[in-house]
């Protein structure tokens, strides 16, 4: 049986880590595409030369021609300018929209049967543009945001409580921006509600527990900017790459994982015609199901606010 083929569009920081992770997990043969000659070839050669040490058997190649992504099973798009300190994700829209147009046309021509995972910012707008230009069905075009935002939320909870990140379950919905919605009610450590653990940590001081949780939520919403501010020359790349690989692996290996995915909604959660982060089951058919659940009044208000921000951003491209 032929190996799967994974094409990565954009040979920058995220693209390089994506190529390495794809190889380490042996998800399939890897093509790293970039417009800069030599860059993707050099990165993939470097990773391939580690194969005897890391024990992986996949072919890696660099490309400067979209024809090389032909026959891809999955395409992950990271192409675009990264954020710099003081910039919001939305500040990138004009420049990255032009890049996304050309990328989407290349995918449509050479990988018409591929699943597409978009990472480029501003995510909600870029994935919308990609789906519109490719014309692919919505189950095959999705954005990576919620997996990363949820991972950040879970990490902050684990560090606050002094527990293993492996035991923390946390979900973040909505747009990939400052209005994202961490769902506090369902956050738990191996089934024990996080709020209950926080209250116990602070001697049953409910006000203090709420204050701490509010700080964790705020840090989650600004987590990308926190990394940008520290790096000064770019944005996060390890955690976004890991998050996209989790999605790709669930599709390629038909794992049926329930993950927060930026998906095109058709009435779910009361939203129609926009890409928003919601829980989805990812399997061999891409987005196989959008999983709805009830939101309380506060969560619904935050979700509505997040959707409004997404609509404003996406509509600004029209």
Swiss-Prot record:
Instruction: Tell me if NAD is a UniProt keyword of this record.
Output: yes
Which residues take part in binding substrate? 83, 89, 121, 152
What's an example Gene Ontology biological process for this entry? Answer: tricarboxylic acid cycle
Spell out the InterPro entries in the cross-references.
L-lactate/malate_DH, Lactate/malate_DH_C, Lactate/malate_DH_N, Lactate_DH/Glyco_Ohase_4_C, Malate_DH_type3, NAD(P)-bd_dom_sf
Enzyme class at the top of the EC tree: oxidoreductase
Q: Keywords for this entry?
A: NAD, Oxidoreductase, Tricarboxylic acid cycle
Its ancestry begins with: Bacteria, Pseudomonadati, Thermodesulfobacteriota, Desulfuromonadia, Geobacterales
Stated name of the protein: Malate dehydrogenase
* Reaction catalysis annotation: (S)-malate + NAD(+) = oxaloacetate + NADH + H(+)
Q: Which SUPFAM superfamilies match?
A: LDH C-terminal domain-like, NAD(P)-binding Rossmann-fold domains
**CDD domains found in the cross-reference section:** LDH-like_MDH (cd01339)
Asked if the Swiss-Prot or TrEMBL record annotates the protein with the keyword Ribosomal protein, the reply is no
Q: Which residues bind NAD(+)?
A: 10-15, 34, 96, 119-121
HAMAP family per the UniProt record, alphabetical: Malate_dehydrog_3 (MF_00487)
Q: Which EC numbers does the record give?
A: 1.1.1.37
Q: What function does the entry list? A: Catalyzes the reversible oxidation of malate to oxaloacetate.
* Any GO molecular function: L-malate dehydrogenase (NAD+) activity
Which residues of this protein are catalytic? 176
Q: Which organism is it from?
A: Geotalea uraniireducens (strain Rf4) (Geobacter uraniireducens)
Q: Which family does it belong to?
A: Belongs to the LDH/MDH superfamily. MDH type 3 family.
């Amino acid at each position: 049986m032929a190996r799967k083929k994974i094409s990565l569009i954009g040979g920058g920081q995220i693209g390089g880590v994506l190529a390495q992770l794809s190889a380490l997990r042996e998800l399939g043969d890897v093509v790293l595409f970039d417009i800069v000659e030599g860059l993707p070839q050099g990165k993939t050669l470097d990773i391939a030369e580690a194969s005897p040490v890391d024990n992986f058997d996949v072919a890696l190649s660099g490309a400067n021609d979209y024809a090389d992504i032909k026959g891809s099973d999955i395409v992950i798009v990271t192409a675009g300018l990264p954020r710099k300190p003081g910039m919001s994700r939305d500040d990138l829209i004009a420049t990255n929209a032009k890049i996304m147009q050309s990328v989407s046309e290349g995918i449509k021509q050479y990988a018409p049967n591929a699943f597409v995972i978009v990472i480029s910012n501003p995510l909600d707008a870029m994935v919308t543009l990609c789906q519109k230009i490719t014309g692919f069905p919505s189950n095959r075009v999705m954005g990576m945001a919620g997996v990363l935002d949820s991972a950040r939320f879970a990490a902050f909870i684990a560090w606050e409580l002094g527990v293993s990140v492996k035991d923390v379950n946390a979900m973040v919905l909505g747009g990939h921006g400052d209005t994202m919605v961490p769902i506090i009610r369902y956050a738990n450590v191996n089934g024990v509600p996080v709020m209950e653990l926080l209250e116990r940590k602070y001697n049953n001081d409910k006000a203090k527990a709420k204050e701490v949780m509010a700080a964790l939520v705020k840090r989650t919403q600004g987590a990308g900017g926190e990394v940008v501010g520290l790096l000064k020359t770019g944005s996060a790349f390890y955690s976004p790459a890991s998050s996209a690989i989790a999605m790709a692996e669930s599709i390629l290996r038909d794992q049926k994982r329930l993950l927060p995915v930026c998906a095109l909604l058709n009435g779910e959660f009361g939203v129609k015609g926009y890409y928003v982060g919601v829980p989805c089951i990812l399997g061999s058919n891409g987005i196989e199901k959008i999983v709805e659940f009830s939101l309380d009044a506060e969560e619904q208000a935050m979700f509505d606010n997040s959707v409004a921000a997404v609509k404003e951003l996406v509509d600004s491209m029209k």
